[in-house]
Swiss-Prot record:
Gene transcribed to yield this protein: OR5AP2
InterPro entries documented for this protein: GPCR_Rhodpsn, GPCR_Rhodpsn_7TM, Olfact_rcpt
High-level lineage: Eukaryota, Metazoa, Chordata, Craniata, Vertebrata
Keywords, comma-separated and alphabetical: Cell membrane, Disulfide bond, G-protein coupled receptor, Glycoprotein, Membrane, Olfaction, Receptor, Sensory transduction, Transducer, Transmembrane, Transmembrane helix
Molecular functions (GO terms): G protein-coupled receptor activity; odorant binding; olfactory receptor activity
Topology Cytoplasmic: residue spans: 56, 126-135, 232-245, 300-316
Protein's recorded name: Olfactory receptor 5AP2
Topology class, membrane: Multi-pass membrane protein
Compartments where found: Cell membrane
Function: Odorant receptor.
Gene Ontology CC entries for this record: plasma membrane
Extracellular face of the membrane: 1-34, 78-104, 157-210, 267-278
Disulfide pairings: C103-C195
Organism encoding this protein: Homo sapiens
């Protein structure tokens, strides 16, 4: 009986919803931030979903490279959509609450797509390595079946990693404050709110995040080191310039993405600054998904040619 009373008392004090404090509590900034992030989100959807449609309808783009790009666009649109709409609503609404299960769902889907993007970027580096290092063997090294398996593995790994993090985070007790000092449900602010011992969670998160990010970064670095060596051996100066141009834009995007992830999740817990982290979070949840279609695709001659053809046929 005593145990039942303790459990009942604990359940009465446990948190059933959270309050997302958002980016700023200054009411004068709410409207400006809403308009700005709405425009960015719309550009994100147009760019990424447009890229998916373009690759789908143009037969010339039905190759492994563009299958990867299409998957990346889907992931960018998805992980931004798991955060941005709720952020936009909270910028204009007085009630900034999110239910316990809603917070868990947002946490899971955001983590799934973010993890999937890490793996996809590594797979795309391997794809570029195979295409430049040995073009004759490229159809064998990255066949349609292998491409599908690489992408499916990326999604499964991302979802599995997010499931572990979500299960470990939301099994904790939240019986004190329910005010999340962030604009979405993220790991550091949630762990700070928990009244359970979060030491083990911190170790597991650090271990999994370190393994995923470092292994993906190593694949990218090794792939591009091999690409760099292969490009230097090219007899054509024009071919070298084209290859270096493609690699430079890709490496810039990878550096921005993994740099922000490393900064956010692979630091000691004691060094977290919520205000600083919110700014960095805006960068990789809102800005990077908009930049990726430009960096990866719109600088590509095949994509621009396909886009002109579609516009000429259906609009002009």
């Amino acid at each position: 009986m005593r145990l039942m009373k303790e459990v009942r008392g604990r359940n009465q004090t446990e948190v059933t919803e959270f309050l997302l404090l958002g980016l700023s509590d200054n009411p004068d900034l709410q409207g400006v931030l809403f308009a700005l992030f709405l425009l960015i989100y719309m550009a994100n959807m147009v760019g990424n979903l447009g890229m998916i449609v373009l690759i789908k309808i143009d037969l010339c783009l039905h190759t492994p490279m563009y299958f990867f790009l299409s998957s990346l666009s889907f992931v960018d649109a998805s992980y931004s959509s798991s955060v941005t709409p709720k952020m936009l609503v909270n910028l204009m609404a007085e009630n900034k609450a999110i239910s316990f299960h809603g917070c868990a769902a947002q946490f899971y889907f955001f983590g799934s797509f973010l993890g999937t993007e890490c793996f996809l970027l590594a797979m795309m580096a391997y794809d570029r390595y195979a295409a430049i290092w040995n073009p004759l063997l490229y159809p064998v090294l990255v066949s349609g079946r292998i491409c599908f398996l690489l992408i499916a593995t990326s999604f499964l790994a991302g979802c599995g990693n997010a499931a572990i993090h979500t299960g470990m985070t939301f099994r904790l007790s939240f019986c004190g404050s329910n005010r999340i000092n962030h604009f979405y449900c993220d790991t550091p602010p949630l762990l700070k709110l928990s009244c359970s011992d979060t030491h083990f969670n911190g170790i597991v998160i650090m271990a999994f995040s370190s393994f995923i990010v470092i292994s993906c970064v190593m694949i990218v670095l090794i792939s591009y080191l091999c690409i760099f060596i292969a490009v230097l051996k090219m007899p054509s100066l024009e071919g070298r310039h084209k290859a270096f141009s493609t690699c430079a834009s890709y490496l810039m995007a990878v550096t921005i993405f993994f740099g922000t992830i490393l900064f956010m999740y692979l630091r000691p817990t004691s060094s977290y600054s919520m205000e600083q982290d919110k700014v960095v979070s805006v960068f990789y949840t809102v800005i990077i998904p908009v930049l990726n279609p430009l960096i990866y695709s719109l600088k590509n001659k095949d994509v621009k040619k396909a886009l002109k053809k579609i516009l000429w046929k259906h609009i002009l």
